[in-house]
Amino acid sequence: MNYRVPSLKATALAMAALTQALTTWDAAYEKALADLASLTQSEKVGVVSGITWEGGPCVGNTYAPESIAYPSLCLQDGPLGIRFANPVTAFPAGINAGATWDRELLRARGAAMGEEAKGLGVHVQLAPVAGALGKIPSAGRNWEGFTSDPYLSGIAMAETIHGMQGSGVQACAKHYILNEQEHSRETISSNVDDRTMHEVYLWPFYDAVKANVASVMCSYNKINGTWACENEGILDTLLKQELGFRGYVMSDWNAQHSTVASANTGLDMTMPGSDFSQPPGSIYWNENLAEAVANGSVPQARVDDMVTRILAAWYLLEQDQGYPAVAFDSRNGGKASVDVTADHADIARTVARDSIVLLKNSNNTLPLRNPSSIAVVGSDAIVNPDGPNACTDRGCNVGTLAQGWGSGTAEFPYLVAPLDAIQERSSGNGTKVVTSTTDDATAGADAAASADIAIVFISSDSGEGYITVEGHQGDRNNLDPWHGGNDLVKAVAAVNKKTIVVVHSTGPVVLETILAQPNVVAVVWAGIPGQESGNALADVLYGDVSPSGKLPYTIGKSEADYGTTWVANGADDDFPEGLFIDYRHFDKNEIEPRYEFGFGLSYTRFNFSNLAINIDATSGPTSGAVDVGGAADLYDSVGTISATVTNVGGVSGAEVAQLYIGFPSSAPETPPKQLRGFQKLPLAGGADGVAEFELTRRDISYWDVGQQKWVVPEGSFQVYVGASSRDIRLDGSFTV
């Protein structure tokens, strides 16, 4: 282990600059249609059907036809690395990637994940994630996605897809749609109005489709009473017609409930082709689909459309040109015959480092300045004594938390614990390190009592509902720290006047007890940082870089402040909050958060000046023809807004300039302000830079339910530019 600060190498930057293969959808469809003519009916239904659970080396495998040169597709999780394979890179989770607010890093992370997937022979990587979006702060899988804000989620989805598909792997946007909790996820109906669907939950999928995503995964839940994977309004009307999606829709694993209904409403591929039992059951397609065509229940044209979409996506990514063979077996330990990790540890470390959010820093306690002694307290500071991969699918919270749990995980090739990195630094500067690596409050206080500085590590975990951890069935039962974290901090802070708290968490944690301790002088949110956890944290704690992460969600003073929680006892969720989730809810109801959306401190200071608004837009609905991503004129530029950001401190740092827009009164009720632009500016001390935000018609439109179109309203739009959703430094307006 070393403590150099990595930089993205030229190769990584080159990967990040990629968009995707040069083939167009039209050219891909031409090739797919030529192949279609050569396939038998048996081969067609094989292309659209999984081989059944554990029927091949990957978590999903399709049948390979003999009539054309087309393989058995390998489909494999996941959103932070390749599941059931080793060695691979265990990247920071999506929620950390979102917290970087850095387009280049989002794309570089996606490119590196895609490169590893292709190297292992994975054709379809089951990522990225826009659902769960995060309307429920305790929801189990929020960490797989990027943020609770639809605009930021959409940008993160697009950048990640460009990175992944630029490396040659098919991306899969998931979970489509309204899969916002783990409790009862396979029976719950998410009942939502049309405007909320479009402006909140569908918004990031617009960006995914616009980025030419190859595939979309429909979710387990029902939507307005009908299963997502046989919901014509969701699969056909919205996705394929309104958004102009030209790829294919696959089911989540065992989320299909019918043969005919799923086929006729827009499902294109069933995964894994059966349920999880042995011998396999619930085989809805393959021969059963052929029979449904033969008896007239499913039109032949629908099956041909399924096959064409799947083949076209394969051609779009040019996977017909020397694609690697599958190099691992999920069911046999996952040991790969090739090492695909390259220099990706540098990217993982950079994302983890630049996602760290400094929440509190009284008296400039951080960065550390070679203290004579440090107490490191808490089980979250060390690697699980049984190893970082001891629990299947990371289904435990033992040792430092660097992944959530469930199918969206990967095997750690190694895990650098915070204590390891701190000890490495301390050995070079003469700092004595004392430890208490349990969560026992008395032992923690004993270790901290005589130290110059105490660093307490606490965590809060969550994951997928098929695993229950410490009584949490995927979703968290509350927003408290686990393992008595509040009591641990109280005990340490009672005896040490310089107590620093580091939080590893899958989502918001209520920090009121911790912040009430006068001796808690700094709080660091480190999220779900992946394999380079300790190194990234040390880079920030010791001042090698200034923290530049910003919260991808709001941290409230209580769980009740959010106005949403997961629905219990098998009931449906009627989404009564509508458009008003996370900061939109806090703003509407004038609730003071503890730390607002977009918040994050630095070791330097930034000023904002010179707001310039150059917008020229006309009111009214979209009128363009539907293209990939929706109505073509939806993405027309209406001008720019810019501001100057100056680093007025003495050290280098990076500021995220954020643009929020408030709609005129002529529009239906909307959130007081909505994120509509951001730019991360790295600036040396004394330097300045210009943040420029280009707005499209979509950015200043609302969804008109009556017209079924996006509409730009007349009137005065409010412009807010600042360092967070509530730290507004400049404001102005423009009129349409």
From Swiss-Prot:
Protein name as catalogued: Probable beta-glucosidase L
EC number: 3.2.1.21
InterPro entries named in the record: Cellulose_deg_GH3, Fn3-like, Glyco_hydro_3_C, Glyco_hydro_3_C_sf, Glyco_hydro_3_N, Glyco_hydro_3_N_sf, Glycoside_hydrolase_SF, Ig-like_fold
Its biological purpose: Beta-glucosidases are one of a number of cellulolytic enzymes involved in the degradation of cellulosic biomass. Catalyzes the last step releasing glucose from the inhibitory cellobiose.
Active-site annotation: D252
Cleavable signal peptide: 1-21
Matches recorded under PANTHER family: BETA-GLUCOSIDASE, BETA-GLUCOSIDASE L-RELATED
An individual GO BP term: cellulose catabolic process
Annotated gene: bglL
UniProt-recorded Gene Ontology molecular function terms: beta-glucosidase activity
Glycan-bearing residues: N224, N295, N363, N429, N607
UniProt pathway: Glycan metabolism; cellulose degradation
Family named by the database record: Belongs to the glycosyl hydrolase 3 family.
Localization terms from the record: Secreted
Source organism: Aspergillus terreus (strain NIH 2624 / FGSC A1156)
SUPFAM superfamilies according to UniProt: (Trans)glycosidases (SSF51445), Beta-D-glucan exohydrolase, C-terminal domain (SSF52279)
A Pfam family hit: Glyco_hydro_3
Catalysed reactions, semicolon-separated: Hydrolysis of terminal, non-reducing beta-D-glucosyl residues with release of beta-D-glucose
Any one Gene Ontology cellular component term annotated for this protein: extracellular region
Keywords: Carbohydrate metabolism, Cellulose degradation, Glycoprotein, Glycosidase, Hydrolase, Polysaccharide degradation, Secreted, Signal
